[in-house]
Amino acid sequence: MLPLLLPLPVTPPPPLPSPTLTLAPASAPRRRLVLLAAAAPHHHHHHRRRRVYRRQRAAPTQTRAPRRTLSASNAARGEEDLEEAIYEFMRRSDKPGAFPTRAELVAAGRADLAAAVDACGGWLSLGWSSGGAEAGRASSSVGVHPDYPPEAGAAAAAGGASDLAQGAVWASSREAEASPSGRQPETEEEETETKFGTGLDGMLTRLQRERERVRPPLPRSSDGAGGERDNVALMGQSGAPSHSATGGRYTPKVPDNGNIHSYHPQNGALEHNKSSKSLTNDAWRTWSLDKGGFSDFQAAEIHSTNSRKSFRHDGLDILAQDDVHGPSNGVAVHDYDINDVDSERDDIHARLQNLELDLTAALHTLRSRFDKVISDMSEGDGAKAPNGLSDDWEFEETKVMQAQEELRSIRAKIAVLEGKMALEIIEKNKIIEEKQRRLDEAEKALSELRTVYIVWSNPASEVLLTGSFDGWTSQRRMERSERGTFSLNLRLYPGRYEIKFIVDGVWRNDPLRPLVSNNGHENNLLTVT
């Protein structure tokens, strides 16, 4: 029938009594096939049992959730894709360090991610209980692991991405195998969530506990004490410290040997190498205290005097030998003389240099211990331990390198402080020089003064002296002696002066002195040589 319908656009035929056949548009061939298949049973009876199914398509605005398969690799790939999408959402959100809640995903227009997490379940939905709002607020307030400072920021978020990937594999393996206790996985997840908390904090804590669970014990050396010290140095004082769960709250454990002098969670001190003679306990204590709260110091806050102080922070009593002697507000009281500034500055430089040498020696010791532990484990059957030890070693090495960076920063601050002190000293020296010049001039002027002894020998009851030595502005009383004469001492510069006596209120001249006339006035002449 197609050849008969092709000429229709050129010459339309007259209307016929028979029904006209209309072809379906070319853009919808599926509908045409459906119509032909539906019309087939009228002519062919043997196609009655054949049914045509149409695939139902989902709405284009909704993303299909990843389907679970029996293959562990496919499930892992699906969860990895979902984790990448969630991580991208976290990176672009206002809280990159907090795992998003269901309400946050729906509010941001990502209901598809919320549905995908609900469908995936397991590790990704641990923080999504019925109290989603409370969990969301808890995860938002915590944000990152409590053992890391809040200023870690983007670094914590970036580091959390790798932990998310590890957690996804761990969660998929837990879902694939049955529970060892015979209970449902949901029940175990609820108990774990109640025990360790929800949100990103609980996830990171569970990952750390799982890593410690699968880590075999370290081989002990010949002497038990030495092996225990090495284990404590590499494991107990690592960057991710062990925790003790007490009612959902985790408190960092302090070793019994008391080698941690700083109360900052991230700034724990390394154990000293007992065989190394170059390490100084005083220097390490100073560095720990500076890391703990005295990083922003001034030059007057560093002293060579030793005192013992007890610090209390978060329930931890830490007794350290303090090199900073001063009140509790952080401002040191200095009692040194100004002449000892140079010696104190040299002492500060020497101590900073010793600290830098100690940090370098500690880093070398840490690396040598790690190499020794790795070599011992390679001989034994501990195949999985090097991975965990590598993380601890890298964290300890990072802490030492950060301490070196902070030490360099302190030295830079001291250099700036020395520059300011030099400028202040220069300014003070200029002021001192100016004052000294004025003092010299005054001393020179005083050295030119001469003492003049003036006497009135005539009888009188009261005699006053006035003259041009002060511009005739004052009248000085002369002292009467036992003989009845009046005298007065004056300090005058060399020169010629005019003087006159006031005897009992009458202006008079001394007949024994020379006279001079000035504008019709006669005065006595006084010459100072």
Swiss-Prot record:
Composition bias, Basic residues: 41-57
GO CC annotations on file: chloroplast
Q: Does the keyword Repeat apply?
A: no
Question: According to its UniProt record, in which tissues is this protein expressed?
Answer: Expressed in leaves, stems and panicles. Expressed at lower levels in roots and developing seeds.
- Which molecular-function annotations from GO does this UniProt entry contain? amylopectin binding; starch binding
Where is coiled-coil annotated? Answer: 400-452
Which terms are listed as keywords in the entry?
A: Chloroplast, Coiled coil, Plastid, Transit peptide
Annotated region described as Disordered, given as residue ranges: 1-22, 39-77, 166-275
The record's subcellular locations are: Plastid, Chloroplast
Q: What's the source species' lineage?
A: Eukaryota, Viridiplantae, Streptophyta, Embryophyta, Tracheophyta
Q: What is its main location?
A: plastid
What does the annotation say about its assembly with partners?
A: Interacts with SKIPA. Interacts with ISA1.
Phenotype on deletion?
A: Slight reduction in plant height. Reduced size of the endosperm, reduced starch content of the endosperm and floury (opaque) endosperm.
Any one of the GO BP annotations: starch biosynthetic process
Name the PANTHER family for this protein.
PROTEIN PTST HOMOLOG 2, CHLOROPLASTIC, PROTEIN PTST HOMOLOG 3, CHLOROPLASTIC
Which residue intervals are annotated with compositional bias (Pro residues) in the record?
Answer: 9-18
Descriptive protein name: Protein FLOURY ENDOSPERM 6, chloroplastic
According to its UniProt record, what is one Pfam family this protein matches? Answer: AMPK1_CBM
Q: Which organism is it from?
A: Oryza sativa subsp. japonica (Rice)
| Description of its domains | Contains a C-terminal (448-529) carbohydrate-binding domain (CBM).
Known function: Involved in compound starch granule formation and starch synthesis in endosperm. May act as a regulatory scaffolding protein and affect starch synthesis and compound starch granule formation through direct interaction with isoamylase 1 (ISA1). Binds starch, amylopectin and amylose through its C-terminal carbohydrate-binding domain (CBM) in vitro.
Q: Which SUPFAM superfamilies match?
A: E set domains
Q: Where is the transit peptide?
A: 1-71
